[in-house]
């Protein structure tokens, strides 16, 4: 497996590539995770071992081994973008590269730490680390077309790592992979119908790319079924609702805040996110015992309140006020966000067996 930092990123002759400072950490930026490796090593896979072995066999085939090969379309493509489109597209590349690299680090460390005690699980994580490394390297190479690159080694050493228990890793990464599938395939299908909106050739790779995300999500689906306590019982239902809400709300607020990127692709950020949320919610019903009632008008009304509060927080950040004054000015918006998230969490969920009986 080639780590992202080892991808051939040499700039063309006569060009200069600068190392881009990492984006400031906020609640909306991609997180780096670590977990209880001892608990992962001791995990009993027997309740669903056959399905996990079948998924591992799919990983071994490495369908996209020869997919991520740049072609002549990339030559000069960056020069065709106007300054504002360049700005929002580079931001998209940075966020996506950071997210993929975060997955690589987690999966690679898991595969290394549990290899001797849980070889099947370790092999699955090694294959997924391979995919994430490939994605991150491809994105970082595209950044070099704009004269910038992320120092992935620096990110490894200096990013803050959030500790999650294994079951929380399962919820978060399952949703991340499945929502990634729906995000990529939705953009690909839109641009297939509207080729004039394809601002950069990287989008040509999204159809096969999203299948990696889908297979990774299927792996975590099977892994949760091998650990029935993660998807059964009252507490499991609460955690499933919490992670669904956290992932959907974060994506919606972030995407509306950078709606200019989606406009450059001929998409409306809100419509795009609603479609992705609907599809991800439906897919999640295959494993989670409950899903969110995203058809309830109160759901998106609540997300819009979060968007408004987030915009107000950004305005405070951009002001010339002193740090203590900024905290005081932010306090009511933080409280409003907390109250709104609590209200959304307390909305009645939809039981998965009634929501999607055909797949259960």
UniProtKB/Swiss-Prot annotation:
Enzyme's top EC category: oxidoreductase
E.C. number(s) listed in UniProt: 1.14.13.81
Keywords annotated in UniProt: Chlorophyll biosynthesis, Iron, Metal-binding, NADP, Oxidoreductase, Photosynthesis
GO biological process terms, semicolon-separated: light-independent chlorophyll biosynthetic process; photosynthesis
Pfam families: Rubrerythrin
Cofactor field: Fe cation
Family annotation (InterPro entries): AcsF (IPR008434), Ferritin-like_SF (IPR009078), Rr_diiron-bd_dom (IPR003251)
Catalysed reactions, as listed in the record: Mg-protoporphyrin IX 13-monomethyl ester + 3 NADPH + 3 O2 + 2 H(+) = 3,8-divinyl protochlorophyllide a + 3 NADP(+) + 5 H2O
Record-given protein name: Magnesium-protoporphyrin IX monomethyl ester [oxidative] cyclase
Protein species of origin: Synechococcus sp. (strain WH7803)
Gene it is expressed from: acsF
């Amino acid at each position: 497996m080639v780590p992202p930092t080892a991808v051939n990123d040499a700039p063309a002759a006569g060009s200069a590539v600068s190392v881009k400072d990492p984006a400031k950490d906020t609640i909306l930026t991609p997180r780096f995770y670590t977990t209880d490796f001892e608990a992962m090593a001791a995990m009993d896979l027997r309740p669903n071992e056959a399905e996990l072995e079948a998924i591992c066999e799919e990983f071994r085939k490495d369908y996209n081994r020869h997919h991520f090969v740049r072609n002549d379309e990339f030559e000069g493509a960056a020069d065709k973008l106007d300054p504002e489109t360049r700005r929002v597209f580079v931001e998209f590349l940075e966020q996506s590269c950071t997210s993929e690299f975060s997955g690589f680090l987690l999966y690679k460390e898991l595969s290394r730490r549990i290899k001797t005690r849980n070889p099947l699980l370790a092999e699955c994580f090694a294959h997924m680390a391979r995919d994430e490394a490939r994605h991150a390297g491809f994105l970082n190479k595209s950044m070099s077309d704009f004269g910038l690159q992320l120092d992935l080694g620096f990110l490894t050493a200096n990013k803050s790592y959030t500790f999650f228990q294994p079951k929380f890793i399962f919820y978060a990464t399952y949703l991340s992979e499945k929502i990634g599938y729906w995000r990529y395939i939705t953009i690909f299908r839109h641009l297939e119908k509207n080729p004039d909106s394809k601002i950069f050739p990287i989008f040509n790779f999204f159809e096969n790319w999203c299948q990696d995300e889908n297979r990774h999500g299927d792996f975590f689906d099977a892994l949760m079924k091998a650990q029935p306590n993660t998807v059964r019982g009252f507490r499991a239902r609460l955690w499933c609702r919490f992670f669904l809400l956290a992932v959907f709300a974060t994506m919606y607020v972030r995407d509306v805040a950078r709606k200019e990127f989606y406009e450059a692709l001929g998409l409306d950020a809100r419509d795009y996110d609603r479609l992705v949320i609907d599809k991800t919610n439906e897919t999640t019903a295959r494993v989670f015992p409950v899903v969110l009632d995203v058809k309830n008008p109160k759901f998106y009304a609540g997300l819009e309140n979060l968007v408004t509060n987030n915009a107000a927080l950004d305005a405070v950040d951009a002001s010339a006020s002193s740090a203590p004054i900024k905290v005081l000015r932010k306090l009511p918006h933080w409280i409003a966000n907390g109250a709104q998230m609590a209200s959304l969490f307390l909305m009645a969920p939809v039981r998965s067996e009634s929501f999607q009986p055909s797949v259960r």
